[in-house]
Every structure is written in C-alpha cells, then in structure tokens.
C-alpha cells in the first residue's frame, strides 16, 4: 500500500513539473483517499489546486496540512 501511495505522489510530482495540474490533482486525490491525514500529500494537492486557479480549495488543503503538522513550512 505504501508503494502505491509513493508511486501516486511521484507521478503527481512529475505532472506538476510538466505543468499538467489537472492530471496531477487526480493522483494526489487518490493518495489523499488512502492517507487522508498525511500533511505532505495534502500540501501537494494544494499545489495542484493552486496551479489550476482553485485558490479556496488550495488554501483548505494548506490549512489542513498545517493543522496536522504545524512545523511544515512548505505549506504555502
């Protein structure tokens, strides 16, 4: 199960680099279903949402990530 999540996140990260935020979001959404309280995955989902201009949803993801891990300075 962890490998599957790792693969989803790796694919999502590459898609963000490639600028395909819509497809990246689908990978991060799958990963969030598997680990809903993982602040790193929530942050990545927020990055994809921000790239799509869905700012309110992105802020929700960033805020939840910070609630789960207040030391996470990458949540932006």
State what each model feature region is.
Residues 30-33, 63-67:
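Conserved structural position within tetratricopeptide repeats
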């Amino acid at each position: 199960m962890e490998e599957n999540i790792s693969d989803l996140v790796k694919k999502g990260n590459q898609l963000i680099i490639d600028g395909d935020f819509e497809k990246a979001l689908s990978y991060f959404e799958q990963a969030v279903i598997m680990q809903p309280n993982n602040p790193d995955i929530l942050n990545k989902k927020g990055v994809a949402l921000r790239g799509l201009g869905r700012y309110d949803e992105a802020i929700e993801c960033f805020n939840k990530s910070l609630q789960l891990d207040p030391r996470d300075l990458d949540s932006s």
